[in-house]
């Protein structure tokens, strides 16, 4: 993809900002903001104790990781450490993926409710969301900013413009701050309202604002929103972000969850997490093994797969 773009001029003053809502805000208010802006900041989503636990649980993997060890992501600079499969490495992060507010929002945005028509009847069913990826974005000093992009490009989504419908969205992300994030140390850039743009509309850096957050708050955004990690210009500071991204259960996850999460860990996970990882059959026949739901006897199914 070539060299990374230059930093945004420090004199630039955003003309827009991200709405901030408490994590305890009514779901209707959060959804209304997502529909309007495509992104917002949920304040105090994760407690200080849980942030500290996540940082401690992930630190050994950060120490082992090579900053440039993300060959599949050419839009990520080498100064960013990406630890993949975080829900399999941090029990606290796995628990965060099941927080009520996260569960409610991903269900509201990404659950697919469908009707099948048979020759003699109709049948309603639902397909629950899947975990698309869980990873770190730890940007060290000197890390350049990313190009502005949309995350839903991984599924080849084409944006036709016209009337906007939240039900058409194919990704919902939660970027949880593990440290104080500022414009200067690489806070994520985002363009509110860009989720409604058509495919031909090109983003400009004079349209961005910055997701500055205290530890435990989270940037929540749709896959249609233009965004990108910022430039870290602060010596001796690391911008720590933990990402949880979800997609409809009808799409293929970016991260291969069947291989990314150790099977020994999978067997101890909750039913909700098994569903998010794709081990549990939804309302249709997706994901069946031996003509049945693998989650009903997962140890036996995994044993068979390992034989």
From Swiss-Prot:
Disruption-associated phenotype: Abolishes the production of swainsonine but still produces the 1,2-dihydroxyindolizine epimers intermediates.
For this UniProt record, give its keywords in alphabetical order, as a comma-separated list: Dioxygenase, Iron, Metal-binding, Oxidoreductase
The pathway is:
Mycotoxin biosynthesis
Tell me the superkingdom of the source: Eukaryota
- Supply the EC number(s): 1.14.11.-
Cofactor(s) named in the record = Fe cation
Short name of any one Pfam family annotated for the protein: PhyH
Record: residues binding Fe cation: 149, 151, 227
Q: Which InterPro entries match?
A: Phytyl_CoA_dOase-like
The UniProt entry, under Gene3D superfamilies, shows: q2cbj1_9rhob like domain
GO MF annotations for this entry?
A: dioxygenase activity; metal ion binding
Hey, what's the signal peptide range on this chain?
A: none
- Quaternary structure and partners: Homodimer.
- Role noted for this protein: Dioxygenase; part of the gene cluster that mediates the biosynthesis of swainsonine (SW), a cytotoxic fungal alkaloid and a potential cancer therapy drug. Swainsonine production occurs via a multibranched pathway and is dispensable for fungal colonization of plants and infection of insect hosts. The first step of swainsonine biosynthesis is the production of the precursor pipecolic acid (PA) via conversion of L-lysine (Lys) to 1-piperideine-6-carboxylate (P6C) by the aminotransferase swnA, the latter being further reduced to PA by the reductase swnR.
Similarity remark: Belongs to the PhyH family.
Q: Which PANTHER family match?
A: PHYTANOYL-COA DIOXYGENASE DOMAIN CONTAINING 1 (PTHR20883), PHYTANOYL-COA DIOXYGENASE FAMILY PROTEIN (PTHR20883:SF45)
In Swiss-Prot or TrEMBL terms, this protein is called Dioxygenase swnH1
Q: Which organism is it from?
A: Metarhizium robertsii (strain ARSEF 23 / ATCC MYA-3075) (Metarhizium anisopliae (strain ARSEF 23))
């Amino acid at each position: 993809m070539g060299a990374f773009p230059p930093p945004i001029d420090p004199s630039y003053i955003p003309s827009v900002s991200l709405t901030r809502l408490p994590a305890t805000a009514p779901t209707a208010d959060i959804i209304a903001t997502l529909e309007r802006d495509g992104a917002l900041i949920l304040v105090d989503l994760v407690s200080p104790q849980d942030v500290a636990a996540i940082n401690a649980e992930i630190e050994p993997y950060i120490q082992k990781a090579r900053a440039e060890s993300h060959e599949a992501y050419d839009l990520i600079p080498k100064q960013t450490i990406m630890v993949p499969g975080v829900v399999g490495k941090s029990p606290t992060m796995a628990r965060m993926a099941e927080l009520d507010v996260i569960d409610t929002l991903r269900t509201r945005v990404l659950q697919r409710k469908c009707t099948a028509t048979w020759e003699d009847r109709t049948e309603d069913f639902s397909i629950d969301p899947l975990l698309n990826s869980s990873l770190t974005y730890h940007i060290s000093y000197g890390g350049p900013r990313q190009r502005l992009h949309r995350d839903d490009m991984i599924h080849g989504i084409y944006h036709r413009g016209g009337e906007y419908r939240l039900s058409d969205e194919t990704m919902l992300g939660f970027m949880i701050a593990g440290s104080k994030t500022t414009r200067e140390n690489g806070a994520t850039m985002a363009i509110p309202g860009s989720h409604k743009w058509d495919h031909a509309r090109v983003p400009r850096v004079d349209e961005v604002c910055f997701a500055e957050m205290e530890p435990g708050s989270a940037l929540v955004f749709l896959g249609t929103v233009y965004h990108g990690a910022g430039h870290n210009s602060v010596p001796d500071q690391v911008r720590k972000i933990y990402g949880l991204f979800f997609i409809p259960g009808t799409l293929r996850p970016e991260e291969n969850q069947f291989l990314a999460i150790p099977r020994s860990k999978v067997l101890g996970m909750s039913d909700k997490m098994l569903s998010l990882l794709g081990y549990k059959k939804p309302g249709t026949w997706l994901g069946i093994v031996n003509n049945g739901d693998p989650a009903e006897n997962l140890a036996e199914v995994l044993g068979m797969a390992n034989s």
